[in-house]
Every structure is written in structure tokens, then in C-alpha cells.
Amino acid sequence: MALNSISKSDWQYLVTGFFLTSVFIFTDLIGVINKEYFYFVPRLISDQPHRIFTSILTHADLNHLLSNLGGIIITRYFLMRLGNKKRFFYLKFILSCSFLNFFIIWVYEKILSYFNIYPNYAAIGFSGIIYALFGFLLLTSFYGKKYFLGKEISFKS
């Protein structure tokens, strides 16, 4: 398969881009939905667990959205070069990173609350997942394409 052709798994990237763009249109351009309902705010997660996933769909502004869409295109190119044979790898990676992001922020919040520090912040955007994908690509280039952290990932050698 040529690198400039569309593969069967490209729908994963198109769906991601479509959702990011759609949420931006509905929250920022049309204003139908208040994007503050999507922010990842650690103290609200127990009552509103949907924020674990919706926060990655929300972006601060058009530049933030465009930089994340550019990151999706770049990581798609390199993942395609690696020759991923696993189905739904990209979507599984996104979901895994969302849970990992939630866990890290939750632990951070618990550590700070132990010292009676309660920061007021919200996390938004797809940037963390893009950075995780770049880190994954960097590690697979160093350590090989067949196994990652002891698990078979089935990239061509």
C-alpha cells in the first residue's frame, strides 16, 4: 500500500478530527453548548465522570484546535509508516491515555489535598494524547516495533 493512499483504518483519524471540529463548532462558533460542561475539573469527576472523555474534545481556541488536528495528521503518518496491524489501535490508545490522564491528575489532586492545597484548574484539549503518541513513536523507534512494554504490538519490522 502506498503511503499516500487511504487505508481501511483511516476512519479512526477522520472520526477523531470530526469530533474535535464538531465540538469546537457547537461550543465556540455557534455557542449552543457551554464548553465549561466539558472541562476536566478533578473535584467534579465523582459526580460527572463524562468529563474524563469530553475534556479531550474541548479546545481553548481555534489555534489550539488546529495544532491538535496537525498533530493527529503527523502521528497518523508515522503510525502508518510503522505498519500497525492491530485493529482500533489509535482509538484504544486515545481511551487508554484518557484514563491515564484522569488517574495522574486524580493522584496529583489527592497529594495536594493531603497538604490542604486545593488548586482550582481545568484541563482541556487533545494535546496530552498527541504528546503521548509522539512519546510512543519515539520509544518504538528506540526499542523496536514488535513489542512494547512486554506486549506484542505487531508493527512490521
Write out the residue ranges for each language-model feature.
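Alpha-helical transmembrane bundle and helix-membrane interface signal
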Residues: 80-87, 139-157
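Membrane-interface micro-motifs in multi-pass membrane enzymes
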Residues: 118-142
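Polar helix-capping/helix-linker motif
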Residues: 8, 46-48, 152-157
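Internal alpha-helical transmembrane segments of multi-pass membrane proteins
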Residues: 90, 125, 129, 153-156
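Residue-level detector of alpha-helical segments with a strong bias toward transmembrane helices
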Residues: 74, 111, 135-138, 142-145
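N-terminal TM1-TM2 helical hairpin plus the immediately adjacent luminal interfacial "cap"
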Residues: 16-123
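N-terminal membrane topogenic signal
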Residues: 3-16
